[in-house]
């Protein structure tokens, strides 16, 4: 049988945080909110933990653990934010298409240089660790990608349009010892005709 509730008890209230046009997302056991003007983290009581301002048209925000990576779609600046709110600003000099970050703060960004795509890996302090160069003609458009918890493996979903049909190629790169002897660190790949993989985890 269905239960019917006729009253409630208010246990706790907090003031609204963020902006009216902000996007809200879970951030560990806290709250992350961002907009075109900046990004902030709040605890359960609504107390601001940290804040980073910027100016973006279409912010891309990814978080894992206490680490956050933020960039404007097709912009050239990447923000790497640690658990305490300390931020590193990275000038990529190329438009950013997508990005991901690991729980230890290692970030990977897909950068576009005309028809050439670079998958560039950054340390939490913004140093370039590694880079893979590919092309849209060879691999396709990087639709989504994800970095492994050990910061070594990266999976990429490439979108290809061939003969009026949409196909997806999944490529898996290894930046560790296993991938050192492979061309472009590519250790495996799979093609899926007529399939679309917009997300990777």
Pin down the residues of each PLM region.
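Structural motif
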Residues: 38-40, 76-80, 115-121, 162-174
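Structured, soluble extracytoplasmic/luminal domains of envelope-associated proteins
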Residues: 41-103, 198
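Residue-level marker for isolated small/hydroxyl-bearing positions within beta-strands
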Residues: 34, 71, 109-112, 156-157
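Extracytoplasmic/luminal low-complexity segments enriched in Pro/Gly and acidic/polar residues
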Residues: 161-201
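Repeated scaffold domains used in trafficking and secretory/extracellular systems
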Residues: 16-26, 55-66, 94-105, 138-146, ...
């Amino acid at each position: 049988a269905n239960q019917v509730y006729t009253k409630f008890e208010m246990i706790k209230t907090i003031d609204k945080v963020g902006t009216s046009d902000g996007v809200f997302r879970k951030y560990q056991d806290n709250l992350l909110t961002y907009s075109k003007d900046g990004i902030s983290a709040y605890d359960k009581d609504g107390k601001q933990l940290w804040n980073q301002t910027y100016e973006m048209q279409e912010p891309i925000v990814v978080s894992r653990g206490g680490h956050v990576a933020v960039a404007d779609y097709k912009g050239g600046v990447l923000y790497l934010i640690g658990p305490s709110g300390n931020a590193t600003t990275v000038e990529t000099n190329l438009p950013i298409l997508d990005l991901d970050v690991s729980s230890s703060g290692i970030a990977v960004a897909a950068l576009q240089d005309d028809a050439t795509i670079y998958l560039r890996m950054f340390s939490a302090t913004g140093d370039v660790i590694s880079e893979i160069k590919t092309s849209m003609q060879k691999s396709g458009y990087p639709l989504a990608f994800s970095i492994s918890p050990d910061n070594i493996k990266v999976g990429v979903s490439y979108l290809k349009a061939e003969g009026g049909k949409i196909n997806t190629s999944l490529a898996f790169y290894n930046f560790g010892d296993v991938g050192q002897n492979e061309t472009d660190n590519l250790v495996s790949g799979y093609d899926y005709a007529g399939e679309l993989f917009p997300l990777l985890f």
